Amino acid sequence: MEGKTSSGFELHHGHSKDHRPDLKQLVFCLSICEDGAVPVHHKVYPGNTNDASTHIETWNTLRLIHGRSDFIYVGDSKLCGQPQLDYITDNHGRAITIVPSNWLEVERFKNMLRAGPIKKKLIWRKPKPNDESKTEYYSFYEGHAITQLLDKYSLWWFVSSEKRKRDRYSREDRLRKAKASLIELSVKINRGKLKKKGDIETAALEILKKRHVQHLMEITVKKHMERKQVLRRGRVGNKFQYERTCRVYYSLHWEQDRDALRQETRVDGLFPLLSTDPTIHPRDVLKIYKYQPRLEKRFSQFKSIHQAAPLLFKRIDRIEANMFVFFLSLMVQAIIERMVRQQIKERKLKPLKLYPEERDAPHPTTSQILKTFDGLCTYKITQEDSTIEEYQDQLDYTHRQVLELMDIEEEEYWKI
């Protein structure tokens, strides 16, 4: 699809998370506010746009919307770059972001942890997302480091109990897959392109690098020699000679580095956060950043509930216009959720019975709320184009409760 809109939007090939580099795509930038995670700004960019280049423009737009520059701007690791952070701070703004794992400071601190334990302090407990019967714990390594790449921003180190579990499961899964691949490789050696020791070692190391476990496993290729004595062709006689042959072959062996594994467990659950404002307490830095998943939830709703497929609109200007419509639908959806949840909290009500079998919905979403009204109908008896009688289905307790929380009268609902 060719063409460009007046705002400069066009489709381009870019990095495809669906592994479809043949498809053109777009970048949908979305910003939400802290109050109810309501979307307040969006913009679409060409598909080859680097996410890091959008933060300055987004921050400037949010400053115009908010009317001030001292709000806290939270972003992912693409925000963690000197041009973006310096621009925000030079204009009296504040930012919090997670530090990319390839920064030197991250590897340096991990090496310190691998060498020996560092004192940390429990600073926050909160219910585990999607399972409030369990608790997630966050700890903070006492003291803070000043980043050496940017020279002026506070870098805080945290540990999550749930992330520690995920890191351990991920490492065990990678080790298991690496071992399975090494077993497959071991039956292929001594033939084809795997007859030399160097080629076998290279193939084994490629497997470890692919699974990111090269520092956790040790590879050994052992050389073996097999000698045989073979009779030459011909009749056995006084002049009969024997021929000796020697065949060289290799075997592949591997084992886990127990010391490296023990050291790696010390960095499980670790993640660093950067704050441009040193006056914000580490606990507050953590709580502010942990609001970020609500933005990911909006993106999930954008794809799953609204089933956005902008390329079906055929024309480039229609795509841009319909992305704005999707943004408005996300905003309305978020406002409904915010209204209902606030009313439940202020009135200290019990969770709504929105799920089948009258199960509780402690955090009702707009899609759940609207589904409760599915199947409700209005019936009209007409004669000669005139309505004689009109009936509606009976609303149950949950229906009336939801309408009350949304400040909608029952008569108004039937007129919608």
Where are these regions (language model features)?
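Anion-binding and metal-coordination hotspots
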Residues: 1-416
